Every structure is written in structure tokens, then in C-alpha cells.
UniProtKB/Swiss-Prot annotation:
GO terms for molecular function: ATP binding; ATP hydrolysis activity; ATPase-coupled phosphate ion transmembrane transporter activity. This is Phosphate import ATP-binding protein PstB. It comes from Methanosphaera stadtmanae (strain ATCC 43021 / DSM 3091 / JCM 11832 / MCB-3). Keywords: ATP-binding, Cell membrane, Membrane, Nucleotide-binding, Phosphate transport, Translocase, Transport. GO terms for biological process: phosphate ion transmembrane transport.
Length: 252
């Protein structure tokens, strides 16, 4: 992988004494989509949350090893975690719009990070909603509550809110699991558009989704990466028997 933006070296994570991730070594390529697959409880969401230090919010969490973003360890003591999470945004499994207007949902992060120029905020809100393929559906109701949007629209709003603060990387934790098939297609189309400008790491239980949106896939099992590589190779010609068993439905 020639153009890596994230390097993970000898990563072990623990909740109390429970070793959740075991000796993870992997890279994430810039401006690509990497899918994380594996059965429930295999560690893929825990891994995703190490990439912007969301696990730090859990008191019993600790880690060993390094995660380098653009060559710098994100767990160094001098790292500003707020700035890190601006650079590495997160879209959660369940859409979580704020109980505010559609406009204020997207503007919120900009204001939190100190932007006071309302003309600039307005331009970024519009640009972000367009990038999230939502503008045409909401342009005449920006002052309405975001809670009135459909589930699929709310998830795209959360994506717009994430990209408004200009992240380098977008993490997605099963972003389509609560959506109907039509909304899922819209989010997948959006992912394929966003990868031109962002690096995306997506956790999914939907293996067909992994084949549709990702360039690379990592298969997790019992806290380890069993196999990682080009998505076509993983699904069409897996090197590991455990990978083959999982993607053919023999377990998981």
C-alpha cells in the first residue's frame, strides 16, 4: 500500500483485563474505502473507535502499540483530541441528529470550532448538504427540526455534519444497518462519491455492501485481523480458510 494515511503497529486493546484487539498491524490507504467485516463481537467496532480515540471515553479502556496518522502517533500526550476528532470524523450506526434545525445541525461543528463568520458558515452548510446528496430534499426547510427527517435523510444529515468541519478521514460504524434498501443505496452512492475527497473506513455486517463500496477489506475474528487485502481478492480468492468459511456463510 503506497499511499497510507494510517499505520497501525502492534495494537492491543483492553477493557479492564479483557484483551479485545490482539496484535493488530495494518495500514489504511488515503482516499479509499476500507471495509471491516467479521462476526459480532470480533473487535471491528472497537478497532474503528481507536482511530479517533472514542474508546478513551470508557474509563476501563487501555491500549498498547501505535496508531500513526500522517506519521504522528494519535495517542501521544500532546495530541489535541478535539482536533483529532475533527480530522477523523465518525458516523454512527444510529443516526443521531441534534434536536435543532437542519441548518444548525450542520453549522454546529463549525461554531464549536470557533467559526463566527455567518456568511462562511452558510456557504459551508450548503456545500456540505450538497456533498451529502441532501440539499435538494431540504433546501426549502432548513429551519425545520432535523428530527422530522426520515431515517435515511437523518443519516445523510449526520454525514453532512461530519464533512462540514473538513475531516481527512470518515469512520462509519454500520451506517446503513437501520435503513431501508432505498436509503441504503443512497448512502452507498454517497460513499462512492465521498471517497474522491476523503479516506473512509466502514464497519459492515453486509458483505454485499463491502463488495459494492470498498477497495480494501479486513476480516476480523476473535480480536485479530485474519486477512486483509483488496476486496475482490478477499471475496473471490481468500487465502485463509477462516476467511473463506465466513464469507461463504459457514459461520458467523
Amino acid at each position: 500500500m503506497s499511499n497510507k494515511v494510517i499505520e497501525v503497529k502492534n495494537l492491543n486493546t483492553y477493557f479492564d483485563d479483557h484483551n479485545v484487539l490482539k496484535n493488530i498491524n495494518t495500514d489504511i490507504e488515503k482516499n479509499s474505502v476500507t471495509a471491516l467485516i467479521g462476526p459480532s463481537g470480533c473487535g471491528k467496532s472497537t478497532f474503528l473507535r481507536t482511530l479517533n480515540r472514542m474508546n478513551d471515553l470508557i474509563p476501563i479502556f487501555r491500549k498498547e502499540g501505535q496508531i500513526l496518522l500522517d506519521g504522528k502517533d494519535i495517542y501521544d500526550n500532546n495530541v489535541d483530541v478535539v482536533e483529532l476528532r475533527k480530522k477523523v470524523g465518525m458516523v454512527f450506526q444510529k443516526a443521531n441528529p441534534f434536536p435543532k434545525s437542519i441548518y444548525d445541525n450542520v453549522a454546529y461543528g463549525l461554531r464549536i470550532h470557533g467559526e463566527k463568520d455567518e456568511d462562511k458558515i452558510e456557504k459551508i452548510v450548503k456545500k456540505s448538504l450538497k456533498a451529502a446528496a441532501l440539499w435538494d430534499e431540504v433546501e426549502d426547510k432548513l429551519d425545520k427540526s432535523a428530527l422530522g427527517l426520515s431515517g435515511g435523510q437523518q443519516q445523510r444529515l449526520c454525514i453532512a455534519r461530519t464533512i462540514a468541519v473538513s475531516p481527512e478521514i470518515i469512520l462509519m460504524d454500520e451506517p446503513c444497518s437501520a435503513l431501508d434498501p432505498i436509503s441504503t443505496i443512497k448512502v452507498e452512492d454517497l460513499i462512492n462519491q465521498l471517497k474522491k475527497d476523503y479516506t473512509i473506513v466502514i464497519v459492515t455486517h453486509n458483505m454485499q455492501q463491502a463488495t459494492r463500496v470498498s477497495k480494501y477489506t479486513s476480516f476480523f475474528l476473535n480480536g485479530e485481523i485474519i486477512e486483509t487485502g483488496n476486496t475482490d481478492d478477499i471475496f473471490l480468492n481468500p487465502k485463509n480458510k477462516q476467511t473463506e468459511n465466513y464469507i461463504t456463510g459457514r459461520f458467523g
